Amino acid sequence: MEQTIASVSLREIARWCAWLLTALLITTAVLTSFGRSCWACELLSHFPAQLALVALIPCVTFAVVGRRRDLVIAAVIAAWNVAALVPFYASVPTVLVPPPADARVIRVVAVNVAAENRDRARVIGFVRATRPDVLVVTELNDFWVRALDAVAADFPIRRLEPRDSHYGIALMSRLPLTILDDKPAGAHAVVARLPQPRLTIVGTHAFPPLSPQLLLRRNQEFAALAAFVRRQAEPVVLVGDLNSSSWSPAFRDLLRDAGLRDTRLGRGVQSTWPAWLPMVQIPIDHALVSPGVRVHGRFVGDRVGSDHLPVVLDFSVDAL
């Protein structure tokens, strides 16, 4: 009799713990929709993969204790999070065919080197190994200006804007492009234009939305970026650390308002931060393209001593 009571009690405890976890997951799903105006809700939107795994715990628990109705509810929550991942694995990629024979394939590499990082050998080694046509570096400071001297000869066109904060930025190019002074108002960005094929490249580093004030500034940056991209007569490639995942409501607004496409679609989530903790990594370093840009390859590079992983994008531009 005592064993039966203990068994029932343990089953009930497991059930109620599973329900508590399910309630937290439901609350999280609801709160993420308020990410445009609530910085904590914005942060909750970044983890559908991890939340899908967590949702398996109540699913298994309800199955074991024989609570079918509860299992259905928990399974719906798990499916909700899985659904956020499906476009990155099931969508048709930006392009399915190789570039035309007469098209030039351009490689852009974006790397947040981390201002405190001192592993110049790994960063320089990665740049030399990937041989980008255009290199965008964020969190540029005086140390990284000196470190990049090692590859300066490979990039005759350069704009380096170091800062003591985390918002220094650089654009370095092998291609005969022009660095523009015209750039998105209020955004940490560098802009270049290539005459042939006609193309605008934007490198940027957005504020992290870690307070109401920073959320507002980040949203203003996104609005400025969207307006700037819309003004361009030629195709646009926008790369950099946006401090926002692909599931953020504000990020989705940026894609919609700018007319850009997330190059992850059909190629996997390709998370980039934090570099040393794969189980909780989220994709906050981006490569976005406008119509007229055909993506032929996109991948995340190896660790370079930074808390971010670099992003590599190969593409061609349709003739205008």
Residue spans of the language-model regions?
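Short, Lys/Arg-rich, polar N-terminal cytosolic tail immediately upstream
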Residues: 1-12
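Compositionally biased, charge-rich terminal segments
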Residues: 6, 26-33, 259-264
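Membrane-embedded alpha-helical segments of integral membrane proteins
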Residues: 16-63
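Short, aromatic-rich membrane-interface segments at the entry and exit
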Residues: 41-42, 68-74
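Small-residue-rich segments of transmembrane alpha-helices in multi-pass membrane proteins
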Residues: 53, 84-87, 228
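N-terminal signal-anchor transmembrane helix
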Residues: 64, 72-129, 181-183
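Soluble catalytic domains of enzymes that build or remodel membrane lipids, polysaccharides, and related
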Residues: 104, 108, 114-128, 134-320
